[in-house]
Amino acid sequence: TQDRSSAASDVYKRQDFLLSNLNGTNKISNKDLEGDYILNVWASWCITCMVEHPYLSKLSKNGIKIVGLNYKDDRSDALVWLNKFDNPYDLIIHDFKGTLALDLGVTGAPETFLVNNGKVVAHYQGEVNQTVWNEVFQPIINSKNLSLK
């Protein structure tokens, strides 16, 4: 586990982007992402993403706001994957070339960021599960009194 939240937060704070949603029907910019939320980097080709997916679905069903960043993935493969395994994301950004992910310092999938009003306050590389949630994310959510709903 690595926490590069300080470096990533600076980049994320000033990073303007305009990418399409996963369906290709709308454009999404940094201005569309407000408040507190989880940003999860995932791909249909990522085995570990499949392992963590049920936990993300559980978080989503509990009202946690999750934005998906679909990373270097084929749009149709990703849509099929979500139809098969459930869609826990409130919004999905399709980052086919990986440009936004690169700007965030992403080295692979899955990676998960906790975002507080446009600033990354936590960054986890690897599978998010109950233990990671309790040890990495929940203490920050509690200390900053974040509302992820």
What annotation goes with each model-predicted range?
Residues 1-8, 12:
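Single conserved hydrophobic/aromatic residue that forms the stacking wall/gate
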Residues 18-27, 91-95:
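Short gly/ser/thr-rich secondary-structure transition/capping motifs
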Residues 28-50:
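Short active-site neighborhood of thiol/selenol oxidoreductases, capturing the structured segment around
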Residues 38-39, 66, 112:
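Hydrophobic beta-strand anchors of alpha/beta hydrolase catalytic cores
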Residues 50-85, 96-102:
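Structural microenvironment flanking redox-active thiols in thiol-disulfide oxidoreductases
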Residues 84-88, 95-141:
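Thiol/disulfide oxidoreductase modules built on the thioredoxin-like
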Residues 146-149:
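Non-globular targeting/processing and membrane-anchoring segments
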